[in-house]
Regions:
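Short, contiguous alpha-helical
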Residues: 23, 36-40, 44-47, 57-100, ...
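Hydrophobic alpha-helical core bundles mediating ligand binding, dimerization, or RNAP-core interactions
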Residues: 39, 43, 50, 117, ...
């Protein structure tokens, strides 16, 4: 008699022979894909903000205690290169990183700042795309603190949108009534909800 075991997939319960080879995405692969997709949405928010800004806007600071978009980009660039270069084999806080200098950088133009933005994101995404499911339970260190890989990823999943949100908010302050919304515009919730319902409840052809 062929033994059977149960696999839970979402809300479905599959009863499969123990000898059956199961070809489906593992939880680890699903997690990595989800992390990459979420990070790409954060990058897109930044990209769409930059597209609305002039050169001088990157250096605007709301007050003395706030950072400009230029400074935030420099900080994210330094963080991403430090955290994701040789991610599995070296401490995430590299000895050649000067974090304090990221907050008092020499001025750069819009094109140079966006180049740093792209370099940081490219390093991050290339590393995540190279990871395999079995890497997720390995241990890495950040400032000598041991973390399993999945926790190290989650740490940055919280850190980066924090700063992207700052970029978007400063962009909205600068553009004011000329700001082009990056999410659901005010007063458009019902319309968007209806469109999403139609999109996701279409009858299969």
């Amino acid at each position: 008699v062929t033994k059977k075991f149960t696999i839970f997939v979402g809300i479905q319960i599959l009863f499969l022979p123990a000898t059956t080879q199961i070809f489906m995405n593992s939880l680890g692969a699903i997690y990595l894909d989800s992390a990459i997709r979420r990070l790409l949405t954060y990058k897109t928010l930044g990209d769409k903000t930059f597209a609305q800004l002039e050169e001088q806007d990157f250096h605007y600071t709301p007050n003395d205690e706030s950072n400009s978009i230029s400074v935030i980009i420099r900080h994210l660039h330094g963080n991403m290169l430090s955290r994701w270069t040789n991610f599995l084999t070296e401490d995430g806080e590299k000895t050649d990183r000067n974090r304090d200098a990221e907050f008092t950088p020499p001025p750069l133009g819009k094109e140079a700042l966006i180049a740093l933005w792209e370099e940081g994101w490219s390093c991050l995404l290339a590393t995540l795309r190279s990871l395999k499911e079995y890497d997720l339970l390995k241990t890495v260190t950040i400032r000598h603190e041991p973390l399993i890989v999945i926790d190290a990823i989650n740490r940055q999943l919280a850190h980066y949108p924090h700063h992207v949100g700052q970029i978007v908010y400063i962009g909205k302050m600068i553009r004011n009534e000329k700001w082009q919304s990056l999410s659901i515009p005010k007063g458009a919730s019902a319309e968007i909800n209806q469109k999403m319902k139609e999109l996701h409840t279409k009858d299969p052809q």
